[in-house]
Amino acid sequence: MRSEILASAFLGLAVRSIISLYSYSGFDSPPMHGDYEAQRHWQEITVNLAVGEWYTNSSNNDLQYWGLDYPPLTAYHSYLVGRIGASIDPRFVELHKSRGFESKEHKRFMRATVVSADVLIYLPAMLLLAYSLDKAFRSDDKLFLFTLVAAYPGQTLIDNGHFQYNNISLGFAAVAIAAILRRRFYAAAFFFTLALNYKQMELYHSLPFFAFLLGECVSQKSFASFIAEISRIAAVVLGTFAILWVPWLGSLQAVLQVLHRLFPVARGVFEDKVANVWCAVNVVWKLKKHISNDQMALVCIACTLIASLPTNVLLFRRRTNVGFLLALFNTSLAFFLFSFQVHEKTILLTALPALFLLKCWPDEMILFLEVTVFSMLPLLARDELLVPAVVATVAFHLIFKCFDSKSKLSNEYPLKYIANISQILMISVVVASLTVPAPTKYPDLWPLIISVTSCGHFFLFFLWGNVQQFSSKLS
C-alpha cells in the first residue's frame, strides 16, 4: 500500500509540475498584472518594510496596488519566501523597482515555492486526513481518497497555474479535520486557527468547528468539566491568535487597520462572474442600483447565517464523523452562495470536504468536483489555462473510473441520468463558448452562462447536502 500511496503522491506532483509550465495570472499584463504579481509584491513589502507598516498605506506601501489583504500568517509566509528570493536575486523584491518584475528565473522560483508547499503541507495533510477517515470508519479507502485528492484539478490549476497558496490554508484545515476525527480537540483548535490566520476565507469552515467543539464541551459530565474544557480550547485559540498578531496588539487602531484590509466592504458583493446567488440575481435585478454596499453586506450576513444554521444546530446536537464532513460541505457552500465578496477560487473550500465525502457518496461528489472546475473556467481561460484544465479534468474523471467498484450509477438510474445530463450540459457550454463568439452587446455572455449554470448546480447540491445530513443514517 505504501508504494501505491507514494505513486499517487508523485502523480500529483507530476501534474503540478506540468501545469506550472503554463501561464499564470496577469502574465505580461501591466499595469496591475494579477495574483502572481500580488504574491510577489507582498514579498517585496514584507521584506523591505517594518512589520507595523505591512497593512498601512504610505509612500512605500500603496494599498491600491495589491495591498496586503490576507491575515498575518500569510504575511509571515510572504516574508520568508521573499527572503529566500532576495538571496537568489535581490531584483525579485527590490522596493519600488521590482513592481511587475517577470523573468524565467523568477517564474521558476515562484512555482517552486508553491510545489514546496504542496510537498511540505498540502499532500501530507491530505494523506493524514485519508488515514484518519480510515481509522474513524474502520475502512480501507485511503488510496482511493488520496489519489483523487492528489489529482483534483481545481486546487492544482489555481495554485500551480493561476498562482496562489491555497494549499497552505487547506492543508492546515485538513489537519484540523483529521484532529476532530481523532478526537484531538486542542490540536484541531490550533490548526484551524492557523488556517484562519492564513486566509480569512477559512471562516467558511468555522461554524462546524465551533458547533462540534462547543457540543463536546457542553456534553461534559459536570459544569466544572465544561468550564475547564471550553477554557482550554479558548486558550489554544486566543493564544495562537495573540502570538500571530503580537506586532499589532499594542494599538487598537493598528488592529482595526488590519481588519479593514481583511474585510473590504467597499469592493462590492462580488467580482467578475462568480457562480453564486447574488451574481445570478444580478442578471435580472441589478443589485448595485437598488442596495448600497453596507446594506448588501447585512443582507449577505443574514442569508448566510440562515442557510448555515440548520446544519450546524444539528451537528451541535448530534456529533458524528459524517455529520461533521457534511456540515463543512453545507456551510462552506452556503457561504459561497450567499456571502459577501466571493471569488471564484473560494469554491475550493467546499471542494475540501467534498473530496473526502467521496467515501460515502462517490458519484454525487465526483460530479460536484467537476462542476467546481467548470465554474472556474472563465478565470482559467483568461490565464491561458483552458487546455490543462480540460485535460486534467478528464484525467481526474478517468482516475475515478479506475475505482468504479465504489460507483452506484449502474443501478441508480435517476442519478445516472442526472449526472449524464449535467456532464453533457457542461461539455456543450464549453464547446459553444470556444466556437460561438459572444455578441458584441454582451461580451460576457459565456462567462455569465457558466456562472449561472454552476450556481444552479451548487444550489441543488446545497439542498442535497442538507437533506442528507437530516435524513441519512450515515450522519
Curated annotation (Swiss-Prot):
GO terms for biological process: chitin-based cuticle development; dolichol-linked oligosaccharide biosynthetic process; protein N-linked glycosylation. Disruption phenotype: Larval lethality. Larvae lacking maternal gny present patterning and morphological defects, including the failure to form a normal head skeleton, a discontinuous cuticle and irregular body contours. Larvae lacking maternal and zygotic gny show severe reduction in cuticle deposition and a complete failure of denticle formation and melanization. InterPro entries: Glyco_trans_ALG6/ALG8. It is an enzyme of class 2 (transferase). It is a multi-pass membrane protein. Its EC number is 2.4.1.267. This is Probable dolichyl pyrophosphate Man9GlcNAc2 alpha-1,3-glucosyltransferase.
